[in-house]
Regions:
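RNase H-like nuclease module associated with reverse transcription
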Residues: 3, 42-188
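RNase H-like nuclease fold core
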Residues: 3-49
Length: 188
């Protein structure tokens, strides 16, 4: 069973010079990180929903590429429920509403219509399934914002492979995390 999960986040107007937002995500394959990204967005977002939507659109392009690559390597995504959607965890309910097409309209999102339509198509075709995650549990927060020392250390240890985080998905799309300390032995 190969399960691809992604945690996505964006800050809002984090750059003091340009007012551009920073996007970040961590891609997990069977609970272990295989890719991560943190970078400045190319356009200025007018609200947090727009910043998160821009981040999601860029992320879904990467997910489609990774799924094709993993398929070529015989790491097809399968689950016991026969749903092969990649689960993307997002901590912004407005961005979820925009991407899933749940009658959310906002004047400031008009000029990202193409990205919104792309996201909605990927959700409808079940390439991705978007789910909400509390911002305090979102590991990709470390890619976009400063965090407290203990929280940063826990997220850093996971990304660097010092701890395992087991991601479990229930039918209600809840997110559970179990952290297990990994022992690393080096031979010299």
């Amino acid at each position: 069973m190969n399960v691809i999960s992604v945690l996505s986040d964006s800050d809002f107007a984090g750059c003091k010079d340009t007012a551009k937002s920073t996007s970040g995500h961590i891609v997990l394959l069977n609970g272990g990180p295989i890719a991560y990204y943190s970078g400045r967005q190319t356009t200025v977002a007018l609200c947090t929903a727009m910043a998160e939507t821009i981040a999601l659109a860029k992320l879904v392009v990467k997910i489609k590429y990774l799924r094709a690559l993993l398929h070529d390597l015989n790491f097809c995504q399968t689950r016991e429920t026969n749903v092969d959607s990649t689960i993307v965890w997002v901590d912004n309910t407005a961005a979820l509403a925009v991407a899933t097409g749940n009658d959310y309209t906002h004047e400031t999102l008009k000029h990202v219509t193409v990205k919104v339509r792309f996201l909605q198509e990927c959700v409808q075709r079940k390439i991705v399934r978007l789910s909400y995650i509390n911002t305090h549990k979102n590991i990709s927060d470390m890619m976009t914002k400063q965090s407290s020392g203990p929280q940063f250390k826990a997220h850093r240890d996971f990304v660097m492979g010092y701890t395992d985080i087991v991601v479990s998905h229930s039918a209600s799309a809840s997110f559970a995390v179990r952290v297990r300390r990994r022992t690393v032995r080096l031979r010299v």
